[in-house]
UniProtKB/Swiss-Prot annotation:
GO BP term (any one): translation
SUPFAM superfamilies, sorted: L28p-like (SSF143800)
Note on cofactor: Binds 1 zinc ion per subunit.
Keyword tRNA processing: no
Gene name for this UniProt entry: rpmE
Cofactor: Zn(2+)
Protein name: Large ribosomal subunit protein bL31
Alphabetized PROSITE patterns for the sequence: RIBOSOMAL_L31
Amino acid sequence: MKKGIHPEYYHDSVVKCACGNTFTTGSTQKELKVEICSKCHPFFTGKQKLVDAGGRVDRFLKKFNLKNEE
């Protein structure tokens, strides 16, 4: 391997989530900021959220005659 071309690797990088959760991991950056993590992601929490983007969800539910479960 050539010397001086590889980025510095930090074994104790801190990852900060928007929900307030923090944990450490290995990375080439000292600090990482993420919007979603395993503590707040719907797949891991079991809570499903429907985000209405301009009434698209309502139109979809109406089109297929489904009930909105919030």
